[in-house]
């Protein structure tokens, strides 16, 4: 259980809403409606879940023109939290996130393409001093009016990253070579929410 890891689910994470008009959005981290989460196999027997507590980001969403969409996210890697202080300390070390040297991870989209009901969001993920392309699949769950007179849209986004792609060489066993990225949430105009 001591080694588990990393994540960056984040990344991911942040994207799509269901507005009919192109608009700029900011991730709502102040209202505790946004989360950057990850999971990784633990010895092939169970899942280890974690989150990053400190992050920020923006995106532009145009339902009619996904090619114009943009996503930018910055994560403070020192904020990793797996509900275990010693493990978190190890994850921040040079064995994994190397947070002292690389205190931020970033995701910057390079393309967004519609694929049936999904949006494929491809971008450059920089983690542990390494930049690699990552694709996230985002799906609109539903949209409509909220009780306060605004518009909301719910979505789910998923992706995977390989540890070795980001120069994370600590051997966690054959079942623990990839980190699953997953975000589910809803968004409103000017804000993006992850639950």
Swiss-Prot record:
Compartments (UniProt record): Periplasm
Entry's Gene Ontology cellular component terms: periplasmic space
Pfam families with a match to the protein in the record: YceI
Where does the record locate the signal sequence feature? Answer: 1-22
Query: What InterPro entries has UniProt attached to this entry?
Result: Lipid/polyisoprenoid-bd_YceI, TTHA0802/YceI-like_sf, UPF0312/YceI
Source organism superkingdom: Bacteria
Keywords of this protein's UniProt record, alphabetized? Periplasm, Signal
Describe the family membership recorded for this protein in Swiss-Prot or TrEMBL.
Belongs to the UPF0312 family. Type 1 subfamily.
- HAMAP family, per this entry? UPF0312 (MF_00780)
- NCBIfam families per the record? PRK03757.1
Protein known as: Protein YceI
Q: Which organism is it from?
A: Shigella dysenteriae serotype 1 (strain Sd197)
């Amino acid at each position: 259980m001591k080694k588990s890891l990393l994540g960056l689910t984040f990344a991911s994470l942040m994207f799509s809403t269901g507005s009919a008009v192109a608009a700029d959005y900011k991730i709502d981290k102040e209202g505790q409606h946004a989360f950057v989460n990850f999971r990784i196999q633990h010895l092939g027997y169970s899942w280890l879940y974690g989150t990053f507590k400190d992050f920020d980001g923006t995106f532009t969403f145009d339902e009619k023109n996904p090619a114009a969409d943009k996503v930018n996210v910055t994560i403070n890697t020192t904020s990793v939290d797996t509900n275990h202080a010693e493990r978190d300390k190890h994850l921040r070390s040079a064995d994994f996130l190397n947070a002292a040297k690389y205190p931020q991870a970033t995701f910057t989209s390079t393309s967004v393409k519609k694929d049936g009901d999904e949006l494929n969001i491809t971008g450059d993920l920089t983690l542990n001093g390494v930049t690699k392309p990552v694709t996230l699949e985002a799906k609109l769950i539903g949209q409509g009016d909220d009780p306060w007179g605004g518009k909301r849209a719910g979505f789910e986004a998923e992706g995977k990253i390989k540890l070795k792609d980001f120069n994370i060489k600590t051997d966690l066993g054959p079942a623990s070579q990839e980190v699953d990225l997953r975000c589910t949430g809803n968004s409103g105009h000017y804000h993006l929410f992850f639950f």
